[in-house]
């Protein structure tokens, strides 16, 4: 056998550097890329990245269950989805999660993700551009408030340009690596 030795220190793989790092050497490719919907296939949630409405009647999504409705709200530059449920105890119960990541360019629609510790989950309400309204996220049952759908690495392979999975079998990621 051969024994290969090197005097160079091999570094660990680089983290995501973003498309702007390519701009100087590849300006045409960079300009073309930033004009595509894929350029904004996933990004942090803010007033510019979220396509839906947060005021008036457009901030609500009603379900076939007359005891459940969703409200989208904005507070202090953060955006939330809240399930409002009339319980058996005749009291209003709320479950609210912050929209932290937007997936989808908004050309067709968007769905939203949130962190719970180091795990990533899909929120139950998405935005459909053709109607300009909030809808159930794909595959979510109408009339139920489901906040525990994990977002696995296979989802992120298509819906993010770069994402560091800490556990490929589950929905565990490095939040600072997005």
Specify the residue positions occupied by each region the protein language model found.
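Short Fe-S-cluster ligation motifs
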Residues: 49-74
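Extended surface/linker regions that mediate inter-domain or inter-protein docking
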Residues: 69-178
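Cys/His-rich metal-chelating microdomains
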Residues: 28-29, 161
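Flexible gly/pro/ser-rich segments immediately N-terminal to CXXCH heme-c attachment motifs
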Residues: 9-24, 32-49, 141-152, 168-178
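Short secondary-structure junctions and interdomain/linker hinges
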Residues: 40, 44, 57, 61-64, ...
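Post-cleavage N-terminal segment of exported redox proteins
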Residues: 1-9
């Amino acid at each position: 056998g051969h024994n290969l030795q090197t005097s160079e220190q091999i570094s660990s793989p680089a983290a995501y550097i973003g498309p702007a790092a390519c701009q100087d050497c590849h300006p045409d490719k960079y300009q073309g890329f930033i004009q595509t919907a894929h350029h904004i296939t996933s990004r942090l949630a803010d007033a510019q990245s979220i396509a839906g409405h947060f005021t008036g009647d457009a901030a609500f999504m009603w379900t076939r269950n007359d005891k459940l409705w969703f409200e989208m709200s904005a507070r202090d530059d953060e955006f939330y989805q809240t399930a409002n449920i009339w319980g058996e105890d005749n009291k209003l119960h709320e479950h609210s999660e912050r929209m932290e990541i937007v997936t989808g360019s908004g050309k067709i629609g968007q769905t939203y993700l949130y962190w719970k510790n180091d795990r990533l989950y899909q929120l139950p309400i998405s935005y459909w551009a053709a109607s300009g309204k909030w809808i159930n996220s794909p595959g979510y049952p109408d009339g139920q408030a489901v906040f525990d759908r994990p977002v696995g690495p296979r989802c992120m392979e298509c819906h993010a340009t770069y994402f560091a999975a800490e556990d490929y079998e589950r929905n565990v990621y490095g939040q600072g690596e997005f």
